[in-house]
């Protein structure tokens, strides 16, 4: 996102304008009897004002229908503010210390933000079920260009985490 490291929003205390792009990769789970495994999408946002949802165009029709039903339940904030929800090419790549994802209007590349001994910085106990196994990264590239906004950041907050829900 556009925030300093670490982002105060992740601690439940947003302090200023936050522009961001978040990759959501659902690896396992079910919703109303349908599998969620393999559903991927990117949400680019201007926090509290708007979102743009980019759905992986590799998803099949069944996955799209399931995601459409899931979106207002599990990702209601993103869905309510969505200016656009569109299927697009989505690329993801990862090495031992970098992570990159891209859709036509938004690109994020991050590198691990090392601790004192060079190992990854992990944070536990954050106030959201979206932040399990939180690992701190730093943006190398964070760009977005659309009719709604144009930004480019580097050296700002980045992270990877796991969302765990049931019910």
Name each model feature, range by range.
Residues 26-84:
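Structured domain cores in non-transmembrane regions
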